[in-house]
Amino acid sequence: MNFKKLPKIELHCHLDGSLRVDTILDIAKKDNIPLPSYNKKELINYVSIMDDCNSLDEYLNKFFIPNKVMQTKENLKRIAFELLEDVAADNVKYIEVRFAPLLHVEKGLNIEEIIESVLEGIKEAEKLYDIKGNLILGCMRNMDIPSAFEVVKKGAKFIGKGVVAIDLCAGEEPHFPGKYIEVLKLAKEYGYRITIHAGEAGVGENVLEAINLLNAERIGHGIYIKDCAEAYKLVKEKNIPLEMCPTSNLHTKASESYEAHPFMDFLKDGIKVTINTDNMTVSNTTITKELEMLNKFCGLSIEDYKILYLNAVEASFASSETKEVLKSYVKEITA
């Protein structure tokens, strides 16, 4: 089965985890940014999981270097453009890029300038390629609560202009949703859609709380609902889409192997599963690679993929017009 030629949708892709290594090197040289190595083969080890990784926290260390080159308008625009260029080459028709604006203020940019720069890169790529992109703003759980309010408030002016949703990301502690009730309440009032990283690092109950306390419409990862019957039941009853990222889950030790990953069990049981990359560079993956691995190790069929694709269309925060266009590509999903 040629997965490369199939139309695809990406709902969970971090901008700072999906840079070209050549671009990191190019910007570092241009802007005099120190790197541990200026040799591409050596640098890859600092930004990608090449062999083993023991935890989500270790995985997140791979973002340190990419963020060093994402501190100017020009660089942010370029990196956003290149991400859409890369996924368009993988026949991705629609992507929701997510990033945390406050990771990009080191050289004095304000939140509005940061968001504008990324949106400019997305829009420039849309003009050149058969792809549509939207932006999800991330609030970092390892920063204070006022910082989350700041992102929500300052990003609101871009809703309807490319920004579609708010997210909570970074390391996952038990019962984190309780801290963010007022933040997400405000986000909902502004008109943001809501997706929350939860159930990625061993705490299925966080998914339950993300839905009940934060009004999450989608869940990033959600793999650990397999160990929380109440969360599983709620996700199924409310038809909450899961943005699953199998290779990333292997890297963070949320799953031992592709075969052991619960996505197929969830899919067969009617859970609205979608397949995503999480971080193309950190996990050294593409949507095509994800599908090839799931086909090889889990028996993913073309009919399964049709369901996954339509799940992603429905789960997306795209406009109704864009969704209709995306649905029209279903006829191209053939073995």
UniProtKB/Swiss-Prot annotation:
The record marks H221 as: Important for catalytic activity. The active site is at E200. Keywords: Hydrolase, Metal-binding, Nucleotide metabolism, Zinc. It catalyses: adenosine + H2O + H(+) = inosine + NH4(+); 2'-deoxyadenosine + H2O + H(+) = 2'-deoxyinosine + NH4(+). Zn(2+) binds at H12, H14, H197, D278. Substrate binds at H14, D16. CDD domains: ADA. Its EC number is 3.5.4.4. GO terms for cellular component: cytosol. Its cofactor is Zn(2+). GO terms for molecular function: 2'-deoxyadenosine deaminase activity; adenosine deaminase activity; zinc ion binding. Binds 1 zinc ion per subunit. The keyword DNA-binding does not apply. InterPro entries: A_deaminase, A_deaminase_dom, Ado/ade_deaminase, Metal_Hydrolase. Catalyzes the hydrolytic deamination of adenosine and 2-deoxyadenosine. HAMAP family: A_deaminase (MF_00540). NCBIfam families: aden_deam (TIGR01430). This is Adenosine deaminase. It comes from Clostridium botulinum (strain Okra / Type B1). The lineage of its organism: Bacteria, Bacillati, Bacillota, Clostridia, Eubacteriales.
